[in-house]
């Protein structure tokens, strides 16, 4: 079964809070969102983050591999420009987005494209699972998990000629959801000038 089939099946059969609501990192730091502009939601799923951005007056491009997810998002939020695409073959245009969100989707070769896709002063929200998740979910493919410190190191300002600034970083177990514990690395950064 390929990724698209797996996600289509999952979105057809599972009803989970986490699929339909915005991530806490985004809602807690809504103060960083501009009043207008174009945003990109990578691996948008059922549109929780995309809907939140739209409700804050932003235009939203949402990309997901699942046509089931995209169809559901479009029925709830017709204004979202939703794209069915495999992110392994997706091009992020340079200097286009004021906000990019990337929650629980790890594709390391997209990181530089996300930075380059931001306009000056644009903000990137990233949150991915850590290898620590293997202690409670050994079935997870380690390829899709971050090593300790990996996210912060990958976005070190020196790697991007000083054109980014980390605004917030956290690594560890999320304490707000005890029924579904998650070890995550989360970061908010801004592109400078």
Placement of each model-derived feature along the sequence:
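Conserved SAM-binding loop
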Residues: 73-74
């Amino acid at each position: 079964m390929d990724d698209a089939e797996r996600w289509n099946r999952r979105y057809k059969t599972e009803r989970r809070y986490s699929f339909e609501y915005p991530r806490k990192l985004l809602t807690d730091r809504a103060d960083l969102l501009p009043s207008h502009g174009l945003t990109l939601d990578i691996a948008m799923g059922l549109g929780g983050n995309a809907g939140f951005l739209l409700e804050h007056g932003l235009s939203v491009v949402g990309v997901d591999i699942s046509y089931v997810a995209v169809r559901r998002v479009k029925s709830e939020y017709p204004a979202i420009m939703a794209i069915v695409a495999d992110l392994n073959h997706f091009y992020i245009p340079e200097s286009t987005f004021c906000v990019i969100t990337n929650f629980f989707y790890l594709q390391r070769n997209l990181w530089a494209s996300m930075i380059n896709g931001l306009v000056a002063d644009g903000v990137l929200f990233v949150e991915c699972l850590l290898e620590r998740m293997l202690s409670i979910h050994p079935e997870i493919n380690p390829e899709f998990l971050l090593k300790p410190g990996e996210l912060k190191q990958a976005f070190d300002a020196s790697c991007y000629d000083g054109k980014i600034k980390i605004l917030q970083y956290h690594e560890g177990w999320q304490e707000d959801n005890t029924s579904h514990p998650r070890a995550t690395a989360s970061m908010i950064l801004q592109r400078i000038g």
